[in-house]
Design a protein with these regions (language model features):
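Charged, alpha-helical scaffolding/interaction elements associated with membrane systems
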Residues: 16-17, 42, 267, 294
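Contiguous beta-strand/loop segments that form the cofactor/metal-binding neighborhood of enzyme cores
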Residues: 34-35, 47, 52-276, 282-334
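Structural motif
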Residues: 40-43, 70
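Active-site Tyr-X1-5-Lys
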Residues: 13, 35-39
Length: 334
């Protein structure tokens, strides 16, 4: 979803039509993130006071030069409902993907880095890292109540404040690797760091034994072989724990993310990352970018899904914008 409204419409569409939707928040099916969530929720580091979540840079205005549209591309259809006249074709926006002949994109589509077409790293990696923070502190389906952009009154980083007082800051969590995407939970009795293929804690005895090998690893993307081995080991441990009648925890899963989705299509149960989870995380990312573009704090009521009396924020395109014909947004009433 590019806007808050699109996320809200997706929730209604899924629930009204009794569908099963799994959001691509695959970190929720990753053992290291599940362990971090459990440690936070079980009080391993005490009361959570702040969260550092490094995701990357926000979007910038479209800066790619206009180029001729290839004859085999319907660029008008590719744009969909976007109505910004400044959007023009450049091959980096939509790298070619083809099944016949087979061709995979050689770079990430640059549409995600520009504010006319995407939400930058704020949503690209924020959809993953902010999502884990939301899960750990019990804010699924909800979110922060105030967003303050970087640079406002001299602030060094953008911040998000929850009603319970917890403040999440988009800033580096590793001093020696400031660009590494990941999360650091800081409590009144220690800290937990987690990223893809990495986990650490101020008290390392809290880290499950099957993850001890990740303590010394620097944040990176795990190989498919490592991921497969980790799941096999974890699934065996989970099976053994169930035989003993132990509770595996709210965020544990005995299957990878896509298998979890397939299983839920069959069972009609909610998957590990249902549509409401994706909506609340997307809303958080959009609100951070709205505050950044307005250059001031923005207050949000996650219960009423409104900006209160802030008409400027409510009229921002990242909340809702008028689609161009023939597109419309069902299931959403402005």
């Amino acid at each position: 979803a590019y806007t808050i409204a699109e996320g809200l419409a997706m929730v209604k569409a899924v629930r009204n039509n009794k569908r099963v939707l799994q959001v691509g928040s695959q970190q929720r099916s990753s053992r290291e993130f599940q362990a971090a969530i459990d440690m936070v929720q079980n009080g391993a580091i005490g009361h959570i006071e702040k969260i550092y979540a490094r995701v990357g840079e926000p979007p910038t205005p479209l800066s790619l030069p206009e180029m001729p549209v290839p004859a085999n591309l319907n660029f008008n259809q590719w744009m969909g409902p976007l109505n910004d006249p400044k959007i023009h074709y450049h091959p980096d926006l939509c790298p070619p993907i083809s099944l016949d002949p087979e061709e995979n994109e050689k770079l990430w589509g640059a549409w995600r880095w520009f504010q006319e077409t995407g939400n930058g790293y704020t949503a690209d990696w924020g959809a993953h890292m902010f999502d884990i923070a939301q899960a750990a502190i019990g804010m699924d389906g909800s979110g922060p109540v105030e967003f303050t952009p970087k640079g406002y009154n001299g602030t060094q980083y953008s911040t998000m404040r929850y009603a319970n007082g917890i403040v999440m800051t988009e800033q580096p969590y590793l001093e020696d690797n400031p660009d590494a995407q990941g999360i650091k939970f800081v409590g009144d009795n220690g800290w937990i760091e987690v990223a893809r293929g990495y986990i650490n804690c101020s008290d390392q005895s809290n880290i499950p034994s099957d993850l001890k090998n990740l303590i010394e690893k620097r944040p990176r993307m795990m190989t498919p072989e490592e991921r497969k081995k980790m799941y096999e080991e974890y699934m065996k441990k989970l099976k053994d724990s169930k035989k003993k009648g132990n509770d595996a925890g709210n965020y544990e899963t005995s299957a990878p993310h896509m298998q979890n989705f397939i299983d839920c299509v069959r069972s009609r149960e909610n998957p590990i990352a249902p549509v409401e989870v994706g909506c609340s995380t997307n809303t958080l990312c959009c609100l951070q970018n709205i505050a950044r573009e307005l250059g001031r704090p923005v207050k949000w009521n996650p219960a009423t899904l409104s900006f209160g009396n802030d008409k400027e924020a409510a009229s921002h395109r990242l909340y809702w914008y008028q689609y161009r014909n023939p597109y419309s947004l069902p299931y959403f009433c402005k």
